[in-house]
């Protein structure tokens, strides 16, 4: 509870918690078990932006400290860039691209998602935006 900054929720009844608060507790419970790997499906889907960033930062920190691998499915590619260090892109149910951040190019994104996107760099970070 303390590591995920959830002390303010400890005394509350579960029925009083919002969906986002329940999501944060579920993630904290999974991390507390110190498994070898955790699988997240849209781990920040019910969270506001402030809590989304907190969860990502704390999950990354705990994963490093406790040597836990995190496998996460995300539809927000910018969040994936922030969260991950290895990436797998599926197309037609098969892994089409795999690797580190270097595989994330406009060509790969446009191929996998059939959209016109481009990647820009801002403050040494890749950001995916709608293409022209």
Protein language model features and the residues they cover:
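ABC ATPase nucleotide-binding domains
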Residues: 102, 106, 112-132
